[in-house]
């Protein structure tokens, strides 16, 4: 059966390969586990990640566009997953765990609400597909890791509840000075704050925007996305150990990538295998109940996660990290510097204090949107307007 057309029921009851019996540790987004003594903890950690897959029968994108993303939306779903992990860390903490049929905090439903397949959800498939037009991608066209990262950065401006500083490190270079300036800056756009308040929807007893505040933060939580190419057609073996160490960092958000035209969200590794969540199954779109409750079981992977050999990974990836505080960022920088001391391993990217002279700095802090942009986004978020325009920011 084609993986792209699997149903959720098929997925739940199919045979899944269990973890190998090995003494090697299992690493999941900065957490270390033993397969012999902590198997339940591993599965609980995996099940607590938000799992976004293909969906069908959602409202048409653009009013007349696709009602399913089967066959083209896998990288968009992976982008949602890595960004959702950032929001979970931001609002719930890395140690939060989801349990079936157990009441969850209101902030959990606010996070989930931001990714529902509706055009007025901040990071919905509708928003990503429409905003991707500005990155040169037609609706229904397959994305690469860099494109989805750029789109999510633009959409995050309007999520004033989370107040994230999103930085995409280009040219394999992370500039610490740029990130500190970005994270110490106040909210970038008053129009975005107003738009956020207008687009709130009360679900699960809490507005989707939850307590939006204009109080400046000393450090806006950082989402750092680093698009990389780790080889020409196959991953260079010299990067493998460095890639593994990225999953060991407590700031890890994982990796988006996969195989050509088949994206996955990688959350860890065991031995020489990567552990990932697979978006290639089609589930019905989730609709809010009359009481605005979100049925959430299909957003959690309740079976052993998929695995693939590291050597099978396509070399085009994006690595993600989340630093809630400046101390988290400083700690991350120290860990990255230690990676350069790994014998026989190549660093995947360069960490520098200031922008190298040979790299042009283009609008690192230019996150604000002009008035015409805000007007287009207001139209985009207006649930009464079924014929809104495609955005190009």
UniProtKB/Swiss-Prot annotation:
Enzyme category, top tier: hydrolase
Localization annotation: Cytoplasm; Cytoplasm, Cytosol; Cytoplasmic vesicle, Autophagosome; Endoplasmic reticulum
Keyword Ion transport attributed: no
A Pfam family that the UniProt record links to this protein: Peptidase_C54
A GO MF label: cysteine-type peptidase activity
UniProt keyword list: Acetylation, Autophagy, Cytoplasm, Cytoplasmic vesicle, Disulfide bond, Endoplasmic reticulum, Glycoprotein, Hydrolase, Isopeptide bond, Mitochondrion, Phosphoprotein, Protease, Protein transport, S-nitrosylation, Thiol protease, Transport, Ubl conjugation, Ubl conjugation pathway
Cystines in this chain: 292-361
GO biological process, one term: protein transport
EC number, UniProt record: 3.4.22.-
Modified residues (S-nitrosocysteine): 189, 292, 301
Main function: Cysteine protease that plays a key role in autophagy by mediating both proteolytic activation and delipidation of ATG8 family proteins. Required for canonical autophagy (macroautophagy), non-canonical autophagy as well as for mitophagy. The protease activity is required for proteolytic activation of ATG8 family proteins: cleaves the C-terminal amino acid of ATG8 proteins MAP1LC3A, MAP1LC3B, MAP1LC3C, GABARAPL1, GABARAPL2 and GABARAP, to reveal a C-terminal glycine.
Domains as described in the record: The LIR motif (LC3-interacting region) is required for the interaction with ATG8 family proteins MAP1LC3A, MAP1LC3B, MAP1LC3C and GABARAPL1. Required for proteolytic activation and delipidation of ATG8 proteins.
Name used for this protein in its record: Cysteine protease ATG4B
UniProt source species: Rattus norvegicus (Rat)
Taxon lineage: Eukaryota, Metazoa, Chordata, Craniata, Vertebrata
